[in-house]
Amino acid sequence: MQKNFSDVMPVLARHNGEWTGDYIYFSSQGEILDRHKSHLICRITAGEKYPYYQQNTYTWNDGRAEQFELHATCKQARIWFDTDRIQGSCWEIDSKTLMLNWIRKDIPKSYFYEMIQINEASDARSRVWHWFENDVLVKRVCISETKVIT
C-alpha cells in the first residue's frame, strides 16, 4: 500500500501553499550583496512521478524579475530535484526543520546547504543558505517568508 506524502514527509507537507518574503545575500564577511522579494508556490501534487512542485518568482526594486520551476520525486523520505537549474535533495531533521543540499548546474564547482525552520502555526518560516564555490564559503542567504495562501 502506497503511503500518503504527508505521512512520509509531514514537515515538508506543512510548507504546502504560497509564500512571500525577502531574500538578503551576504558575503562571507557579512556585507549585504543583494536583496529581493520572493513569491514561492509550494505544492504537494497527486502526481506519482513528481509529488512535489515549486515555482519561485523573484523581483528586485529595479524592475528585474526571475521565475523558475522545480519538480521533485520522493524516495526514502527525501525529495529529489534534478532540473535544468539544480540537482539535490531535501529531508526532515525534526518537527520544524528541513535540510537541503544541491548544486547549481550553471555555476561550476558550486554547492549549497540550506536549513528551513517552520513555526508551529505553519504560517512563517526562516531559511538560511550556505553557498560554496570551489569548497569555499562565498555567500550566505537569509530568507524570511510568510504563508499567504494555504
Summary of predicted features, one role per range:
Residues 12-14, 93, 120:
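Surface-exposed coil/turn segments at beta-strand junctions on protein surfaces, enriched
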Residues 8-10, 70, 81, 119-121:
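Alpha-helical interaction segments
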Residues 3, 26, 96, 100, ...:
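Generic preference for well-ordered secondary structure
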Residues 18, 97, 122-124:
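Structural motif
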Residues 1-69, 133-150:
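Amphipathic/hydrophobic helical signal segments and adjacent flexible N-terminal regions
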Residues 102-104, 108-150:
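Glycine-rich, aromatic-bearing surface loops/beta-hairpins
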Residues 33-107, 111-112:
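Central antiparallel beta-sheet cores of small beta-barrel/beta-sandwich binding domains
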